[in-house]
């Protein structure tokens, strides 16, 4: 497959004949003589045994023979004038990637020559990296999924090495401009998404080495990634203590907030790797240096809060929040704060999530976080709480909920009522609950365990069916499964209360399509029959007990009569 992709394009191989072959993509490479692989770079030492360059070479070697090996054609007859721009124009990121990496096999200076000739510009290479990032590498993963010798993250690491080879040096010193920093931080983000933190650390270290030290860095994205990778500022990788009921032989006492998502990858370990003194110096620099005053953002401030929470710097975290937003975990909000600070806008949703999560993580309970959130809402009435906020809140509630201590799920239901009130409940207006798959997936665990079919029916009728029935919405299988879970919970709840007519009406009224209706009807019949058998068995037992009791009463009465006769 790799050969098919790159074989139809103009490759700068030495001593390679290109021959036409019938395949789904056109041409296939035919190897005629040995090709010397390029030399390894200073970063390749970490992956020398499984280098992607050798994997690509091996893959090409297995595809060198063609069915039509006698048909030789000229490269100029089939290749576009500028294949690289053609790839970008057609958004063929997979072909661009594999062609680029394969081209390096025969020419170490291939990319530099592309820039010299004008066939490719630095901006176009940056566009290529941005498109990999935005697409999450789906096209590349699809191409290499059947080739166990090729790894997506190692392919990306090869592109990183290639990219750094194009960065100019002055007197042997690397000079990074704004575009370089932007692209390099995209590499870091890609590796973080794939949970390849060692590769992300290598890219970050490359930037730090080029700049001299972390104290000399004034780039926003680089500082955010430094806090994430070396100061614990990545909450999705935090280990969260599980409630006792959730711990089984298959699960651990600690889990991660996003561990329910099948698409989320996790590193084997995650922790702060720098002394607290370094973290304090970095935060002090961000707060006090003039160059940073215009670079504050929700992402940067929230990452600082996460880092302080992960390193258990409670006092400094409280001080940072108080300095920025006038809210203290002790005492009332600072009433004069807004008057004193002319610019005191409400914190972003991202910051509120960070503050909430950090207090819960630090305290190992919900109380402190709820109290400080209440203070924020009172001081900043125009605060906006989006789906991500509610998702994170119910995730925390579920992780820390222990039904042995709290059978009613107090905090979980508190979260549910808070979300309803925030969206109009109690104001006389129609309640429009937000739709978010993960929110209701988390709530389902609460309602299922507490057997709350009433709220399940409310969610089906007010949230799930209205959203999934929209014409422009493409319904996913996971969403249909979640809908079926809520429908089944509501239906079974009605059946348990012997409200068979209401359960049947619910099915007819709130099924999304014919298949869903048939499925629910079958489940209804089975559940009803099971319920009737239980009732019948219960009645028989009751009648049997009544008969035994009657016989016992008769025997007692006879004994009393005989006793009087004697």
From Swiss-Prot:
Localization annotation: Mitochondrion
Ranges that cross the membrane: none
Sorted UniProt keywords: Mitochondrion, RNA-binding, Transit peptide, Translation regulation
Disordered: annotated segments: 536-555
UniProt record, GO biological process: regulation of translation
GO molecular function, one term: RNA binding
Keyword Methyltransferase annotated: no
Transit peptide: 1-35
Disulphide bridges, residue numbers: none
Keyword Mitochondrion: yes
Origin superkingdom: Eukaryota
A GO cellular component annotation in the UniProt record: mitochondrion
UniProt family annotation: Belongs to the AEP2 family.
Function: Required for translation of the mitochondrial OLI1 transcript coding for the mitochondrial ATP synthase subunit 9.
Assembly with partners or alone: Binds to the 5'UTR of the OLI1 mRNA.
Protein name: ATPase expression protein 2, mitochondrial
Gene from which this protein is expressed: AEP2
């Amino acid at each position: 497959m790799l050969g098919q992709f790159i074989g139809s394009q103009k490759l700068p191989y030495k001593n390679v004949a290109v021959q036409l072959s019938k395949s789904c993509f056109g041409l296939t490479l035919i190897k005629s003589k040995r090709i010397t692989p390029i030399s390894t770079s200073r970063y390749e030492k970490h992956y020398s045994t499984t280098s992607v360059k050798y994997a690509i070479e091996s893959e090409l070697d297995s595809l060198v023979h063609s069915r039509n090996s006698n048909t030789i054609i000229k490269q100029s007859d089939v290749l576009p004038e500028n294949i690289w721009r053609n790839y970008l124009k057609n958004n063929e990121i997979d072909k661009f990637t594999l062609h680029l990496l394969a081209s390096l096999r025969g020419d170490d200076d291939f990319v530099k020559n592309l820039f010299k000739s004008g066939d490719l510009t630095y901006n176009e290479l940056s566009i290529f990296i941005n498109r990999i990032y935005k697409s999450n590498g789906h096209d590349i993963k699809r191409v290499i999924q059947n080739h166990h010798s090729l790894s997506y993250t190692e392919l990306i690491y090869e592109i990183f090495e290639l990219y750094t080879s194009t960065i100019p040096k002055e007197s042997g010193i690397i000079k990074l401009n704004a575009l370089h920093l932007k692209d390099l931080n995209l590499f870091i983000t890609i590796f973080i998404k794939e949970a390849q933190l060692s590769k992300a650390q290598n890219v970050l270290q490359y930037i730090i080495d080029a700049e001299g030290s972390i104290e000399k860095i004034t780039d926003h994205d680089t500082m955010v990634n430094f806090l994430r990778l070396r100061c614990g500022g990545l909450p999705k990788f935090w280990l969260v203590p599980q409630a006792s009921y959730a711990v089984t032989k298959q699960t651990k006492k600690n889990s991660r907030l996003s561990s329910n998502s099948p698409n989320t990858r996790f590193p084997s370990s995650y922790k702060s790797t720098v002394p607290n003194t370094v973290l304090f110096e970095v935060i002090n620099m961000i707060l006090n240096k003039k160059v940073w005053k215009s670079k504050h953002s929700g992402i940067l401030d929230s990452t600082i809060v996460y880092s302080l929470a992960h390193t258990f710097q409670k006092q400094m975290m409280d001080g940072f929040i108080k300095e920025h937003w006038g809210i203290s975990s002790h005492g009332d909000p600072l009433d004069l704060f807004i008057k004193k600070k002319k610019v005191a806008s409400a914190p972003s949703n991202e910051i509120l999530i960070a503050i909430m999560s950090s207090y819960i993580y630090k305290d190992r309970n919900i109380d402190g976080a709820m109290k400080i959130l209440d203070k924020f809402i009172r001081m900043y009435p125009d605060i906006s709480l989006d789906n991500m906020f509610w998702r994170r809140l119910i995730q925390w509630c579920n992780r820390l909920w222990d039904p042995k201590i709290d059978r009613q799920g107090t905090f979980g239901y508190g979260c549910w009522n808070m979300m309803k009130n925030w969206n109009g409940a109690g104001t006389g207006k129609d309640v429009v609950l937000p739709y978010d798959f993960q929110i209701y997936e988390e709530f389902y665990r609460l309602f299922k365990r507490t057997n709350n079919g009433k709220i399940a029916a409310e969610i089906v009728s007010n949230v799930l069916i209205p959203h999934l029935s929209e014409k422009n919405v493409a319904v996913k299988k996971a969403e249909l499964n979640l809908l079926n879970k809520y429908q089944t919970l509501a239906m079974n709840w009605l059946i348990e209360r012997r409200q068979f007519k209401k359960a049947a009406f619910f099915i007819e009224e709130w099924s999304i399509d014919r298949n869903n209706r048939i499925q629910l009807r079958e489940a209804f019949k089975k559940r009803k029959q099971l319920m009737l058998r239980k009732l019948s068995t219960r009645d028989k037992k009751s009648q049997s007990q009544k008969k035994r009791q009657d016989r016992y009463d008769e025997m007692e009465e006879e004994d009393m009569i005989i006793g009087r006769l004697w």
